Amino acid sequence: NLPHPETAYAEWLRVLAPKGILLNYDAEYAKDHHRQKLPAINAHADVSAELLNECHNIYHMLEISLFERPRWDLEILKALGSCSCSVDQSVGDRIYAEQDIFYIPVPMFCIKAVKN
C-alpha cells in the first residue's frame, strides 16, 4: 500500500511522456480481509495471525483505506488533469483464469490513464 497515493499518481503522470499509458492493476485486498473465507491452502496460510493483524492495522492507518476504489482513483486522475482514464473491473477474471493457492477472492481492477 502506498502512504500517499495521490502524490504517486501525480508523479507518475508528471514523468509519463505525452500519449504515454499508465496502467495500475490493483484490488482492495485488505479491505475486508478479516471477513474473507479463504481455503485452508492459500498464499497466506503460513503467515502468523500476529503478522496478519499488523498488516490489517497498517492498512487502516492509510488514508486510501477510507475510499471506494477504483472510483477514487478515477476521480484523482481526472482532478490531476492532462489525461483520459478508464477502469476495467473484469481484469481479475482474465488474470486469475486458474484459482491456485495465490488466488484471493477480491475483485481486481485495472486503471488506465493516457497522458494528453
Describe the residue ranges of each PLM region.
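A short glycine-rich, Lys/Arg-flanked "PGG" loop and its adjoining helix->strand segment in the class I
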Residues: 6-18
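Short proline/glycine-enriched turn/loop segments at secondary-structure junctions
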Residues: 97-103
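A short His-aromatic
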Residues: 1-2
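Short hydrophobic/aromatic beta-strand or adjacent loop that forms the aromatic wall/cage
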Residues: 104-112
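Catalytic cores of large soluble enzymes that bind and process phosphate-bearing ligands
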Residues: 11, 65, 106
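C-terminal alpha-helical "lid/dimerization" subdomain adjacent to the S-adenosyl-L-methionine
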Residues: 25-97
